[in-house]
Amino acid sequence: MRLFRKNTNKIKVMALGGLNEIGKNMTVIEYKDEIIVIDAGMSFPDDEMLGVDVVIPDISYLIKNKDKIKGIFITHGHEDHIGALPYILKKINIPIYGAKLSIGLIQVKLKEHKINNAKLNVVSPRDIIKLSHMEVEFIKNNHSIPDACSIAVHTDQGIIYHTGDFKIDLTPIDGEVMDIHRICELSKKGVLLLLAESTNAEQPGSTMSEKTVGAGLDDLFRKASNSRIIVATFASNIHRLQQIINTAEKFNRKVAVSGRSMVNVVAVATELGYLNIPDNMLIDLNDISKYEDNEVVLITTGSQGEPMSALARMASAEHKKVEIKRGDLIIISAHPIPGNEKLISKVINSLFEKGAEVVYDESDIHVSGHAKQEELKLMHRLVRPKFFMPAHGEYRMLKIHAELAEELGMPSQNIFVNKTGDVLEIDRNSAKVTGTIPTGNVLVDGLGVGDVGNIVLRDRKHLSEDGLMIVVVTISKEDGRVLAGPDIISRGFVYVRESEDLMDGAKNVIKDVLRDCEDRNIKEWAYLKNCLLYTSDAADE
């Protein structure tokens, strides 16, 4: 870790997550004696993180500077932007600011974690939270979830504009378009630094409007006039949920919901008025058998093939209430998150094996919620920042986004393709990376947060590849004599019934070692264990 010089007239901008990766979005802005945090997301574990449930950012820098933190400001309610909040609030109870739906979804998460004392604050677009040295403004955005916002941080050095996740959708489902007028006003005042998402920076053109999905769903529902329809999508894609409900209403189908997160989101979004479900249309999952196949639509989690999701359990015949049958139409209305392709493929194959028709990976049933190249260019032209730092994406995405900015005329020395933990110091005249802060992954395994480290992951990997052998032996504490055993328990190593000679040979080796230790009057458990371990290593050689 390089230490950076203390300069209270410089604004420090640091990412604790979201750079060189998908997910775990978290940005820290520090000015004088104040810190604000934008988003606090989680990500999913990769293939090497065996047994890990979720990954959250390392917040040791925030814990060290907790007295400076004025709040966490949420751009929208997706898991990669709010998923780490319960774990953070257990360590630092600081105010949370977000739009109504974002706060509603956060409340559900905090309730699951039994956190009752959170300081939650609902804001509206164009609201400004005034601090001593910064003012934080929420600005209406378009994304795949309602109430998405960008954030403008006003300082006496200039404005820092953080886009959050966005797309430029001129025909959004809820009719709420991006507040381009306010962005232009900020541009006239002068934007010092732009942080813009890079998720689709590799993709040419513009992202299609969410409304185009409606036509694709309409066509599939019409063709499946005699089939039961099951639609899997992201629970938090509320605009998509609304379109599925609208299509179901058009074809006189009832709607049931499966999957814990889907049930929670539908309940919150309906209660807050973001999801419009006609009276008597939503039915209990237990009641779907009371209706003919062509009278019901099931909306479910599992669009990413998550092993414990509702769709995955249906595919493996482990769902308690839904059994896939021949003739079912399964619509997977989502693109795979990088790394999930194998999981999704496994689920799709299982669904086909059960006789279902599966529609997936088609452009007319899913559109992205992230800006492509032409929208990113437009954002740069609207904001006209002095400095630029691409955010939210893997390295190649950040790099391509930086090249787009350079093509638009921004000097290369004003563009910063940073890594997580880099400290960008900036004022009205200059910007420079001056050091780093501690960052990394904190692995959540069940109730344990940060308990799983590299050594534990290494051991889990070895167990998964090589199996396990346990030697059970009872030894007298007084004189070191063997009282019982040795017995050998093996899992994932060899099939014992077909390897009796091998196991008998191993027992004989262990007996010889124990006999030698007994003759030498060795009683210490640690020494005995090492003798057996080194004997095993020697046998391997």
Model-flagged regions — what are they?
Residues 6-7, 520-533:
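Short, intrinsically disordered, charge-balanced linker/junction segments flanking boundaries
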Residues 208-332, 337-338, 345-348, 352-359, ...:
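Hard-cation-handling environments
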Residues 2-73, 78-290, 309-323, 342-346:
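His/Asp/Glu-rich metal-coordinating catalytic cores
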Residues 534-541:
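Conserved small/polar residues in nucleotide/adenosyl-binding loops
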Residues 509:
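Histidine-centered catalytic/metal-coordination loop motif
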